[in-house]
Amino acid sequence: MTRFSLTVLAVLAACFGSNIRPNVATLEPKTVCYYESWVHWRQGEGKMDPEDIDTSLCTHIVYSYFGIDAATHEIKLLDEYLMKDLHDMEHFTQHKGNAKAMIAVGGSTMSDQFSKTAAVEHYRETFVVSTVDLMTRYGFDGVMIDWSGMQAKDSDNFIKLLDKFDEKFAHTSFVMGVTLPATIASYDNYNIPAISNYVDFMNVLSLDYTGSWAHTVGHASPFPEQLKTLEAYHKRGAPRHKMVMAVPFYARTWILEKMNKQDIGDKASGPGPRGQFTQTDGFLSYNELCVQIQAETNAFTITRDHDNTAIYAVYVHSNHAEWISFEDRHTLGEKAKNITQQGYAGMSVYTLSNEDVHGVCGDKNPLLHAIQSNYYHGVVTEPTVVTLPPVTHTTEHVTDIPGVFHCHEEGFFRDKTYCATYYECKKGDFGLEKTVHHCANHLQAFDEVSRTCIDHTKIPGC
């Protein structure tokens, strides 16, 4: 939690009796790492426990999620056997290192209960006191309020709830954070200037702009859209240095309607199949995806989109193709560098269990390393190089699909149909990656010899 000097604190306490957070920038970028307690129950490499967290790569680790008891309005353990009886919360705080250990209350199903609790003074008091008691008992350093789906009618009560936390946090070092949605319709439900005064940081859920619920494929978290969301909150009064940008450590996946229609905006017939660990349609954790790519490299075409700081893969089977939007260490490193340069507070990651925490594809935590190595004050460094183990390719080799360009070697190659389009093929973490480029206009064509765009009449067939 950001603090004034002792003198200023004394003046504020005398004048206001408040713990309101100042709007001054902090020096260290934040990496807010969300940990889902239920991943303890997964099997194999998908299982994760607090001891598996590398807290040197996170400034804040967030234990999620807690609820609110509908009858008593006290904070509620959602898995009491794991959290309490198996001492999972204690293990979490005991292994926090130098990171701030926080709890997250709420989530996608808690909006109605938040509304009821925040509406009554006595309920607010009960909830906040029970939360502070739990944090103190188990050694937590702060709380994230994730009131998803908050309505405009709840705006004033949300501020009253934050004010109650502020009152109980007085003379402590507890950290206060809130999560804000990325949906345009929700922006004005939040009194952003007031919220900014009460919190140390705001976690903006700048992810899942599309997914398998849509009938066309696209980047799930394109950087321009993420920045647009952050700027929308900034225009409404949120200081940049108090906003962290959420990034996914998972992929959104689709089944393509036609195998030879693989571009952004092409139609999908449904969600991609479930992963081994996460067991969710249209969703793969990074550690599920990297294992799959390494096992069947020849079946994947990976395309990098520099304009959107994005990457996607097409995985071709014998009878269908999957379209996979994901993040890698290069996209995350570039985003970390750019948001730091623009004055934002850092990133939040969703979630640690989706990272390669066990190093099944190479070095441990490649995505977190990429973020941290590109953060500080816009200083550009190369992302940490991940050493990948030798890959044993399957004997299956996917036949090129007519109308779809595939990289077979490094270099620059003109499209066979549209001469003004060309492809750059270069080695990446998982084999050859393709980047699509276009000449300035349709009267030009790409010359593979000079590697420049020239008059199309000078190239036979163009």
Swiss-Prot record:
Keywords in alphabetical order: Allergen, Chitin-binding, Disulfide bond, Glycoprotein, Secreted, Signal
Glycosylation: residue positions: N338
Gene Ontology MF: a single term: chitinase activity
Every Chitin-binding type-2 domain range: 404-462
Localization, UniProt: Secreted
GO cellular component: extracellular region
Keyword Secreted carried by entry: yes
Pfam families: Glyco_hydro_18
Reported function: Probably a non-catalytic chitinase-like protein, which binds to insoluble chitin and enhances the activity of the catalytic chitinases. Has weak chitin-binding activity.
PANTHER family recorded: CHITINASE, CHITINASE 4-RELATED
Protein name, as recorded: Chitinase-like mite allergen Der f 18.0101
